[in-house]
Amino acid sequence: MLSFVDLRSVLLLAVTLYLVTCQEVRRGPRGDKGPPGEQGPPGIPGRDGEDGLPGLPGPPGVPGLGGNFAAQYDPSKSAEPGQQGIMGPRGPPGPPGSPGSQGFQGLPGENGEPGQTGPVGSRGPSGAPGKAGEDGHPGKSGRPGERGPVGPQGARGFPGTPGLPGFKGIRGHTGSDGQKGAPGAAGVKGENGANGDNGSPGQAGARGLPGERGRIGPAGSAGSRGSDGSSGPVGPAGPIGSAGAPGLPGAPGAKGELGPAGNNGPTGAAGGRGEPGPPGSLGPAGPPGNPGTNGVNGAKGTAGLPGVGGAPGLPGGRGIPGPAGPAGPSGARGLAGDPGIAGGKGDTGSKGEPGSVGQQGPAGPSGEEGKRGPNGEAGSSGPSGNAGIRGVPGTRGLPGPDGRAGGIGPAGSRGSSGPPGARGPNGDAGRPGEPGLLGARGLPGFSGSNGPQGKEGPAGPQGIEGRSGAAGPAGARGEPGAIGFPGPKGPNGEPGKNGDKGNQGPSGNRGAPGPDGNNGAQGPAGLGGATGEKGEQGPSGAPGFQGLPGPGGPPGEVGKPGERGAPGDFGPPGSAGTRGERGAPGESGGAGPHGPSGSRGPSGAPGPDGQKGEPGAAGLNGGLGPSGPAGIPGERGTAGTPGTKGEKGDAGNSGDYGNPGRDGARGPAGAAGAPGPAGGPGDRGESGPAGPSGVAGPRGAPGERGEAGPAGPTGFAGPPGAAGHTGAKGDRGAKGPKGEAGSPGPLGAHGSAGPAGPNGPAGSTGARGDAGPSGATGFPGPAGRAGAPGPPGNVGPSGPTGHPGKDGSRGPRGDSGPVGRPGEQGQHGPVGLAGDKGPSGEAGPAGPPGAAGPSGVLGARGILGLPGTRGERGLPGGPGSNGEPGPSGLAGSSGPRGPPGSVGSPGPVGHSGEAGRDGHPGNDGPPGRDGLPGAKGERGYPGNTGPSGLAGAPGPAGSAGPAGKSGNRGEGGPSGPAGITGPSGPRGPAGPQGVRGDKGEAGERGARGLDGRKGHNGLSGLPGPSGTPGETGPSGSVGPVGPRGPSGPSGPPGKEGRSGHPGAMGPVGPRGPAGFTGPAGPPGPPGPPGHAGPSGGGYDGGDGGEYYRADQPERKPKDYEVDATLKSLNQQIEVILTPEGSRKNPARTCRDLRLSHPEWTSGFYWIDPNQGCTSDAIRVFCDFSSGETCIHANPDEITQKNWYINTSNKDKKHLWFGEILNGGTQFEYHDEGLTAKDMATQLAFMRLLANQASQNITYHCKNSIAYMDEETGNLKKAVILQGSNDVELRAEGNTRFTYSVLEDGCTKHTGEWGKTVIEYRTNKPSRLPILDIAPLDIGGHDQEIGFEIGPVCFK
């Protein structure tokens, strides 16, 4: 399918090419309206809306566990039923009702697949009007015709098209006042007037729909520590034994049966005063009170609804002429008017409609050569060639350089667990964990005793006087409602009328509280109090309903490397590779066998003369005597040729790392942690359901005048106005611009050919000739382009208001406009409706008890009251006596899930357990919450050219473009043949009387022409320019790896390559044992109140009262969110405990990585020695065979060249390379993107974490001595190294500061390049890395040096 964008591009290009290549072709009819444009990019997110009204109350919460009746009766006295007791006082609120609480908002879902292309959008707005055409060539002036005889009166012609604007006449007399002009455009908003007097309060408006649920307010600061919860049942106190040695963890025993319930403890002391009971039912309405004093005037109310239209006003004065309105639609053709006075000869008419489509023009020039297309896909591998003839065995090559570190081998199977290792020291304290998620809703707590009575609050200001609502009809009698929680304090009743003054009676004794009366009828609404001060921040609301899925999030981060693909097909043999980069240091190999003996060295220098011996007697020639003492060592021989590489040595003995011990016993639960920090603001909740519509409000005051609305649709033509006074003839106007050439009319009848006269000289322009006879009416030409707007006409009479146009189709959503300036201060609005009831004030002092009212009729069931405040902790009951343990029974079948136990006292802090084994990958967590809308993305890169689109359906006709300029006068066409008389049209409205024109000459009677037919539609346009390329598509999945191809020819040995990248992450290990139970999270928010319980009734102590309501709790709802959160936290903790060596999860040292992943091989990994933020992690090479962490220099090679020429004849001395020769730049060790300062910090930590360090430097030489001078046999020309703590490392001297040489190829001046490998190992890591080197034997024109700086390795 062709996309919509392509179609638009095709049409645009078609129009462009058509205009370029077809200048001579006449213009076709105006094309249909183009298809709508693409939807613009998303606007900038708007400002947050104002907080909506509070939503309706949520559904009731889940039922709480039953209360514990243990302290309310004594089982020892329960054998006989007691007498029916009197009705007890109203019980505490019952357990919550059954509907469950609203779940937490789900985690955000994964991004959905891209949706299918949507349907074609609605038609877009009309395109902009086209440019005006170029002026035509000026026509020749016609010859003046002879004046013909006056013809007979012609038939009444059709009303002519309006002529061009006439010349400006002489200023006429002032006409009489015209009719009232059309209303002008809205004026600029005037300044705010002074505030008017307060209007009388309007009637209460209809209750507005509930606003959207307001945002969850910011979390309050951590509250003071709550009162302790009720203590659990006290167990028998055992003697405190001495702490035993930790034993091995035993196997978990089978779950024991529940022991028999213990006897009830003695009755506890009387509890504190109970909570206030629920408000009693309303008593009967009292007599009306005395009329109250007048309330304070209320603030100005909000603007009311627009009032009913007023009566028509008096006619206004004449309005300023409005701007010319848009042309109305053509009226129906009017009846033929009376013949007008013959007008002067009109100018050439406007250009007619385009003629029929001409023949297709010649093909346009070929376009430019297209851009080079993208590279095609790689071709499939060719077939493998035939195997070549086996070559002759080559001679044995020299030993190659150390190979690169091999790729990561497949993970080995997990070894068996070893014996438990010795207990390690306690690890460092871990970082504080992230604040936990909001806990699940807690079970309702036990009712506490009442707090002390609060102080009497200050008197509130007087409220707005409310209007009494109409009394509703009495509802049907409902079932008795359950007792709700105490409701908020009701409003004051209206003052009653003055009663007759009674005689004062004697004060009676205070009566006993009477029984609760039945609910009275609802009293009339009291007067509204004055607006109270803003209440404190309310508690966080219950979690909102599940939000709709959010929009697709931004592209996620790059995913982890995919799993290894399946082997691909054999590839063709590769060509010889280029010389590779320097490889990472290989793992230390075992010692090789001794190489063959080197060639004999040169003879040593002759030894010194021995002491003169005593002369001996001449003896016989003896046999060979024993060998004499060894001579003085000869000069150092040249290095022998390297021996062949020895076989790999046997594996060394196992290291000290023990096998992981068995899992330790589960430690006791830790103490509850402090409450976490306040959570961030929650997402904005959904709007609550719409409330019932209220009573219609009173008519509001008229609003301020609104800004000018958009121009309405053009109304129908009004009735003709009365004829104005004839104005005096105006002055001649300036010459109009040249009109466009009219399209030629059809050919007229051939005239008789006159004799051709000789060309005379051009005469001067003659006077205007008389009008020639009118030609026959030609076929109507096509409608020309709209002319330029004429000068504004006089304001005509305003027509009647047209019918409202149909609603236009909704335009596409525009981009967000810039934020407007703050509006001017508006006038104070009228007094608003009475606000919702403010929070209850503090309880006033208790009044004297009233006399018991008569029992009212039982009221309808009330709505559930708000939850009361939590009471203080009750006194703990006394300890029960210990029951004897029963005999062990057989193991029963699994019982139903028991109720959650009460929170135990915190146990002692357990020892840190050893790290658990790797867990299995967790299941996917529930979808996360919707992310916030992303900011508007930047404009994407241009996309590739899309395929050509199909031609769209013709759009609706566009609106008329602006009038074009007047064209130059065109040539007159020849008269056309007479047309057939057309049907007479309906009579049009009489036009206003025009200005009297000059008397015209009589024209000949013309025949009536035919109506022309509508021209054909123009050709479809050529393809448009290519659209902007679309956004880059998502990367394809990695294809499978092919099988290993045949080996290519051996390349030349490369340089030592740099260290390779770290291998792919190994497979996830088996799941480790569960960790110790973490500290309890902060307490969750209190649960919503439940439904009230049934009435207590009489108490009957039946037999065996050992059952509690809490033994059969209703099934606890599954808490998937908590499970998913715990699983996610476990995974995050495992990631922290077992670092991956990645940039996001670096280890501290390579040793930590090896301990966490013993199966991993050496390679590059990320570490963060100073811990903390991972943004300064460094990439290092981990040598797991030696346990070293190696940091490379940057750069690690110094160019080999002549760095210094000694121009003086002074003796040579050591010159520091970095400080003197290299412009003050010493050797540096830091990653790209990491500053030297950050790297210095990491190196400082690395030195603290290590107790050994080593580094080597390769000195490349040409005619320069690095270590041993072969001529002198001494080390006086050896280089000096500078350590990181400014210590100088030399070839000889103190052994702690001397380096060793692994290979010395720079012992004499040979004119060839050689190298010397220097190594320094130390138990003082602070001396490394090496920062500078000072050679001595340099300065000659033929002396060149360079360096390779090896990695510094810490262990």
From Swiss-Prot:
Protein name per Swiss-Prot or TrEMBL = Collagen alpha-2(I) chain
InterPro entries given for it? Collagen, Collagen_superfamily, Fib_collagen_C
Localization annotation: Secreted, Extracellular space, Extracellular matrix
State if Calcium is listed as a keyword.
yes
Which species is this record about? Aquarana catesbeiana
What domain notes does the record hold? The C-terminal propeptide, also known as COLFI domain, have crucial roles in tissue growth and repair by controlling both the intracellular assembly of procollagen molecules and the extracellular assembly of collagen fibrils. It binds a calcium ion which is essential for its function.
Signal sequence coordinates: 1-22
Residue ranges, compositional bias (Pro residues): 276-290, 1080-1091
Gene field: COL1A2
Which cysteine pairs are joined by S-S bonds? Answer: C1150-C1182, C1190-C1353, C1261-C1306
